[in-house]
């Protein structure tokens, strides 16, 4: 049995299917504050579980072999600053307390590259922690709570993953929005096309999960982004080549884009995906290097271009 806290989300659903398909688990329990679309499928059970509250020890009939803590408040904007800390820190405390209560010795926690803040140059796991957002600021102390759990008893194993923005089949996030905007001919660079942006394909992330589950080290911390990390202009060129698009893509200064995003967002009652905070975030460099994975010899199956091919093979409707 494996338990995925935050299992109703994009990563959790893909992870559950991969664990079952590869035989790493015969039963996956998805615990989330939202119902899961996978509930009731073979090998999958689900519960409405709020990690901000103490977690009952009888969540599953037998103790889990692995616990995956993906639960987090992460959308920016959308929450008050205090909400990131209330959820992400309470969640870390309650999930680790649950692991102790049921005697589970293996825990995988998803943190974020947001703990580094903006990264102009290549940044690996040895870089200083310098978050600039409440989300990033809440994730590093959550890492430390998990580390305290790992160090509190012999035989415990902890994997901490700091992923970039994860994309792939079924996720209507930044990459899919960029693809659709390029296809329709209205994408513009938010600032410079030369900034590096670090993204991770869901299938590659799941490869890294399996790789780390098989490692012997008691504590591992790693970045997950596709290697190499490329400038935004190169990512756009890959999308255009994949789509066969000749639409020009021009850089627009933030002094124009941010006010325009504010007007659009206000006109749509605050429900626009084009939000000033997201525009500024899109223009912020994230030059992340998966140093730990490279040092351990992890076989990266995807770069950005090949991930688009695999994505369209799995979910052609996303590209329709």
Spans of features found by a protein language model:
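Active-site Tyr-X1-5-Lys
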Residues: 130-159
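NAD(P)H-binding glycine-rich loop region in Rossmannoid oxidoreductase-like domains
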Residues: 51-87, 98, 116
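Conserved C-terminal active-site "lid" loop/helix of NAD(P)H-dependent oxidoreductases
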Residues: 37, 202, 237, 260-299
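Mid/C-terminal beta-alpha module of Rossmann-like enzyme folds, strongest
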Residues: 211-274, 309-320
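Amphipathic terminal alpha-helices
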Residues: 290-295, 299-320
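Substrate-positioning beta->alpha
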Residues: 171-177, 191-213, 219-220
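N-terminal Rossmann NAD(P)H-binding glycine-rich loop of SDR-like oxidoreductase domains
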Residues: 2-21
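Conserved Rossmann-fold NAD(P)-dependent oxidoreductase catalytic core, especially the SDR/UDP-sugar
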Residues: 94-134, 154
């Amino acid at each position: 049995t494996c338990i995925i806290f935050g299992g109703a989300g994009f990563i959790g659903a893909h992870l559950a299917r991969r664990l079952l398909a590869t035989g790493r688990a015969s039963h996956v329990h998805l615990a989330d504050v939202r119902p899961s679309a996978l509930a009731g499928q073979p090998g999958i059970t689900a519960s409405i579980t709020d990690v901000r509250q103490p977690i009952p020890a009888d969540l599953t009939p037998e103790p889990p072999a692995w616990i995956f803590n993906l639960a987090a408040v992460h959308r920016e904007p959308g929450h008050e600053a205090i909400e990131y800390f209330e959820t992400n820190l309470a969640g870390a405390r309650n999930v680790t307390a649950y692991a102790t209560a049921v005697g589970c010795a293996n825990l995988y926690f998803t943190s974020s590259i947001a703990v580094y803040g903006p990264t102009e140059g290549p940044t690996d796991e040895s870089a200083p922690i310098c978050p600039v957002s409440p989300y990033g600021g809440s994730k590093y102390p959550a890492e430390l709570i998990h580390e305290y759990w790992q160090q509190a008893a012999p035989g415990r194993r902890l994997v901490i993953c700091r992923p970039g923005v994860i994309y792939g089949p079924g996720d209507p996030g930044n990459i899919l929005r960029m693809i659709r905007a390029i296809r329709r001919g209205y994408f513009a660079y938010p600032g410079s096309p030369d900034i590096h942006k670090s993204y991770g394909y869901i299938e590659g992330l799941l490869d890294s999960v399996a790789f780390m589950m098989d490692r012997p080290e008691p504590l591992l911390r790693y970045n997950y982004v596709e290697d190499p990390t490329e400038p935004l202009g190169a990512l756009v060129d890959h999308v255009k080549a994949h789509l066969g698009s000749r639409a020009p893509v021009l850089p627009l200064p933030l002094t124009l884009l941010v006010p325009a995003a504010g007007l659009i967002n206000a006109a749509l009652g605050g429900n626009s995906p084009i939000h000033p905070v997201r525009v500024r975030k899109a223009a912020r460099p994230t030059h992340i290097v998966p140093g730990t994975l490279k040092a351990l010899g992890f076989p990266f199956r995807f770069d950005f271009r090949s991930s688009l091919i695999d994505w369209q093979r799995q979910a052609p409707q996303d590209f329709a």
